[in-house]
Regions:
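Structural alpha/beta core scaffold segments of enzyme domains
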Residues: 1-114
Length: 114
């Protein structure tokens, strides 16, 4: 709508959504619960990492599985010296606002616990 008005008038246009429209028409980040277990040698060298990730993609969110996979792709290379690596990512669909693709696609969760 804003693009149409801008083209027709030659002036910038702004769309302002009320709270109800905002939740109905936009997406959120995927809520995630991560459980991380680390194993190390006596000298402190990281040798094992286990990550269990549950991603809430909301209702009808098609970005859920890709975001869960991108989280693994962003986290696991950081620990390339670990001899044992385990990642289990699950995406669940709930009666919440749908999660969608935002900036830093799948990257913000890796820094939340590291």
């Amino acid at each position: 709508l804003a693009a149409f008005v801008t083209v027709k008038t030659g002036r910038p246009a702004l769309v302002i959504l009320d709270r109800k429209e905002n939740f109905a028409a936009t997406t959120t980040r995927h809520a995630m619960e991560m459980r991380v277990s680390l194993g190390a040698d006596r000298d402190g060298t990281l040798r094992a990492i286990k990550i269990e990730n549950m991603s809430n993609t909301g209702a009808y969110g098609e970005e859920g599985p890709p975001v869960t996979m991108v989280v693994a792709n962003n986290i696991l290379p950081s620990y390339n010296r670990a001899r044992a690596i385990y990642y289990n990512g699950r995406t669940i669909y709930t009666n919440m606002v749908a999660g969608g693709a935002l900036r830093g696609y799948g990257a913000s969760w890796q820094t939340s616990w590291a």
